[in-house]
UniProtKB/Swiss-Prot annotation:
Gene symbol of the encoding locus: plsX
Gene Ontology terms, MF aspect: phosphate:acyl-[acyl carrier protein] acyltransferase activity
Annotated family: Belongs to the PlsX family.
Enzyme class, UniProt record, top EC level: transferase
Protein name: Phosphate acyltransferase
Subunit structure as annotated in this protein's UniProt entry: Homodimer. Probably interacts with PlsY.
Keyword Translocase: no
């Protein structure tokens, strides 16, 4: 399997991108990586780490898409950018997956306009995995589509279901519709229409779910439009980050707290690991005609290595074909 990696995307590119790629080719069999970006910079990083293998190559790209550029314009105008070059490798069949920690908006535009959508899929959705009290959960969509139709949400649910079953090995994952209340009649026109459609599918649909219940692990796939999803995601990340800061501050405020903190250090370490985004790799753009993984902007080497593992599993489990097959079932049932 060949994986295209945007070597210039993210806060720590190209250093930690290269480090993650080296770790991946050493750990995972059957992968070859093409790093796109400024050849001299990437080669220097490989040389610094004394990499002498033949599983990593460089494709030169002189331009870089920054996070403050208009996404669609950047994708269309910067043809020699590391992100576009990586996407084009997948489009041309020269790679089977693309990974980038660069601009989310630009990668979304690239997944849509360079890779294209799977036939019959209305919108590509961003579907991050997050740690929950019982097990990881997915938000679909987490920001790619601010305005949605009810049928889009059904497709998001289907693609999330495929990901859980194929990639994570979870049979019959639960699907919940994010809403302001659990009752069927709650919500706006979109959620009411989506509820009716989801109820008619063969998904393990548990009904409406309030945002507060998502981290409790009450649902595997939380379905919503991108505006709601991104708000839930950012709130969750903010609360998790501040919780650790507040806890540390309270522990260090007294001698008793310091002693208790020292005794509980292994517990805190395990607890913090559960909230470590690097464990999950990245967020897949589901619905694109190619495997496309968005790594976190602040990804370290471990996160890149795990994103590469994630891409490999998606490829091995034939996730694109599985989405196509499941989409056919929806169409047959007029949903």
């Amino acid at each position: 399997m060949i994986i295209a990696v945007d070597g210039m995307g993210g806060d720590f590119a190209p250093e930690l991108v290269v480090e993650g790629c080296i770790q991946a080719v050493k750990e995972y069999e059957g992968i070859h990586i093409i790093i796109t970006g400024k050849k001299e910079l990437i080669k220097n990083e490989l040389d610094k780490r004394e990499y002498k293998g033949n599983k990593i190559e460089i494709l030169n790209a002189e331009e870089v898409i920054s996070t403050n550029e208009a996404p669609v314009k950047a994708i269309r105008r910067k043809k020699d950018s590391s992100m576009v070059k990586a996407l084009e490798l997948v489009k041309e069949g020269k790679a089977q997956a693309v990974i980038s920690a660069g601009s989310t908006g630009a990668l979304m535009a690239g997944a849509t306009f360079v890779l294209g959508r799977i036939k019959g899929i209305n919108r590509v959705c961003l579907a991050p995995l997050l740690p929950g009290a019982k097990a990881p959960f997915m938000i679909a969509d987490a920001g790619a589509n601010v305005d949605c139709k009810a049928e889009y949400l059904v497709q998001f649910a289907m693609m999330g279901k495929v990901y859980f079953e194929s990639v994570l090995g979870v049979k019959s994952p639960t699907v919940g519709l994010v809403n302001i209340g659990a009752e069927e009649e709650k919500g706006n026109e979109l959620t009411k229409a989506a509820y009716k459609l989801l109820k008619d599918t063969d998904f393990n649909f548990i009904g409406n779910i309030e945002p507060r219940d998502i981290p409790r692990g009450e649902v595997n796939i939380a379905v919503c439009d991108g505006f709601i999803g991104n708000t839930v995601l950012k709130t969750y990340e903010g609360v998790a980050s501040n919780l650790f800061s507040m806890l540390k501050k309270e522990i260090m405020a007294s001698t008793r707290g310091k002693i208790g903190g020292a005794l509980l250090k292994p517990v805190f370490k395990d607890f913090k690991k559960k909230f470590d985004y690097t464990e999950y790799g990245g967020s897949p753009f589901l619905g694109a005609k190619g495997i496309c993984i968005k790594a976190h902007g602040s990804s370290d080497a471990k996160a890149f290595k795990n994103a590469i593992r994630q891409a490999k599993i998606c490829y091995d489990k034939k996730i694109i074909e599985e989405i196509e097959n499941n989409l056919g079932n929806l169409i047959e049932n007029n949903i």
